[in-house]
Structures are given as structure tokens and as C-alpha cells.
Amino acid sequence: MEKRRAEIAAAIITAPTILAMMSTVLRALIFSSCIKNFLIFSMLKHSSYCLAILVYQKNRKAVMWGSDLFYHLRGFSSIFEQKTYIYESILSLQRKNRVRFKLPRII
């Protein structure tokens, strides 16, 4: 777990202001053990609280990035609902773009 946190920290060290802007919910989402084989980073877009999720595989090669990965999670009351939304969105993107990769498992 410490190694994983170090990898996450190393990946976002270049954007400390973005890290400072992240809410407690997002931090919990990133460090959650429910997300397997993925490093999920978030970035606030302007003042709309839309989130861009940049998904990395363990080899740190970007899998997907772009406007399709903007989520508005403010309407979800729990971390579980947010994880479920991200999970379903990734499934949808996989079908749409025929992208193949191992999906995180929601417990």
C-alpha cells in the first residue's frame, strides 16, 4: 500500500495545487482498496466541480484521457455511488471505444 501511495504521489507531484483542491471524498476514492490495478487521479476543471479522471494501468501508461472522462459527481451522496458511476462510465467507454483493459472491482 505504501508503494502504491508513493506511485500516486510521484504521479501528481507536478500538480500540487490540484492535489490541494481535491476533496476528502476524492482522496478516499483514490486510495480505496476497492479500486484494483488502477491509479485514478482527479483534477478539478474550472469552477464547475467537473472532474477529469485520468486512469492509469499499473505500468503508468495512460489508458484513456479526454472529454469522455469528465464526470460531475456532486450529485452522488456516497463514495459507493461515485465508484459505481465511475465503474459504469468506464464500462461504457470500453464498449464505445473497444478499449480492452482490466476493470476495477467494486466491493
From Swiss-Prot:
Keywords: Membrane, Transmembrane, Transmembrane helix. Its main location: membrane. It is found in: Membrane. It comes from the Archaea. It is a single-pass membrane protein. The chain crosses the membrane at residues 9-31. The keyword Membrane applies. The keyword Transmembrane helix applies. This is Uncharacterized protein AF_0835.
